[in-house]
């Protein structure tokens, strides 16, 4: 796909407040994410996410994030929240991820104890997850959660992917311009980079992040 014909999509993850969701919509963010992974400080209950979903602007995707949740837990979220996209950060295989009849993203851990450049090759990923809508490369280690605020070496991203990919892990308004110019992702996913505290977003950081993404897009088009 010709990257120059596309703008960088933006996903704000770890949403816990309706006001933050409304602001994300006003800023033109493409997707907001609710976290249902056990142990996450940004975890919300399905009923809470359902209530906050009402604040979502039209044409903004609602993403449900899981990490080794049971099939019953995922089904409850799908039924209660009605997300448009699922995101899996654990050891879930393709059969599990696609069993909910919704498009899904598969996260690839790129932390120091995660996959190395040899393991994270496009062929292996696409053979393992042939039905994924795309991949998300994050800085956490296998079995760990995102939102750490740490980056990884972007040069380790696999080449030759035939699916869109999102870049995550330690991205904020100070480095997202360089991240986009360096990696040309289909989208960027941010949580801690626009926060005051886990789950509590900062309006100024949200605005600045979006501005920097748009600046990078204009740079790529010039």
Curated annotation (Swiss-Prot):
It is an enzyme of class 5 (isomerase). GO terms for biological process: L-tryptophan biosynthetic process. The keyword Zinc does not apply. Pathway: Amino-acid biosynthesis; L-tryptophan biosynthesis; L-tryptophan from chorismate: step 3/5. InterPro entries: Aldolase_TIM, PRAI_dom, RibuloseP-bd_barrel, TrpF_fam. It comes from the Bacteria. It holds the Pfam family PRAI. Its EC number is 5.3.1.24. It catalyses: N-(5-phospho-beta-D-ribosyl)anthranilate = 1-(2-carboxyphenylamino)-1-deoxy-D-ribulose 5-phosphate. SUPFAM superfamilies: Ribulose-phoshate binding barrel. Keywords: Amino-acid biosynthesis, Aromatic amino acid biosynthesis, Isomerase, Tryptophan biosynthesis. The keyword Cytoplasm does not apply. One of its GO terms (molecular function) is phosphoribosylanthranilate isomerase activity. Gene3D superfamilies: Aldolase class I. PANTHER family: N-(5'-PHOSPHORIBOSYL)ANTHRANILATE ISOMERASE. Belongs to the TrpF family. This is N-(5'-phosphoribosyl)anthranilate isomerase. It comes from Xanthomonas axonopodis pv. citri (strain 306).
């Amino acid at each position: 796909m010709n990257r120059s014909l596309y703008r960088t999509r933006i996903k704000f993850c770890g949403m816990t407040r309706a006001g933050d969701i409304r602001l994300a919509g006003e800023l033109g963010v493409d997707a907001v994410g609710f976290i249902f992974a056990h142990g996450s400080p940004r975890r919300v209950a399905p009923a809470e996410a359902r209530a906050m979903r009402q604040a979502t602007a039209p044409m903004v995707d609602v993403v449900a994030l899981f990490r080794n949740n049971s099939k019953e837990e995922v089904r409850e979220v799908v039924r209660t929240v009605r997300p448009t996209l699922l995101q899996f950060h654990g050891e879930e295989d393709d059969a599990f991820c696609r069993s909910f009849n919704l498009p899904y993203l598969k996260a690839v851990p790129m932390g120091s104890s995660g996959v190395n450049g040899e393991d994270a090759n496009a062929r292996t990923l696409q053979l393992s997850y042939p039905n994924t809508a795309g991949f998300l490369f994050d800085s956490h280690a296998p079995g760990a959660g995102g939102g750490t605020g740490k980056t990884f070496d972007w040069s380790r991203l696999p080449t030759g992917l035939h699916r869109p990919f999102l870049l995550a892990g330690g991205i904020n308004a100070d480095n997202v311009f360089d991240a986009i110019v360096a990696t040309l992702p289909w989208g960027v996913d941010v949580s801690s980079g626009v926060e005051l505290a886990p789950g509590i977003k900062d309006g100024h950081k949200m605005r600045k992040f979006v501005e920097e993404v748009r600046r990078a897009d204009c740079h790529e088009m010039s």
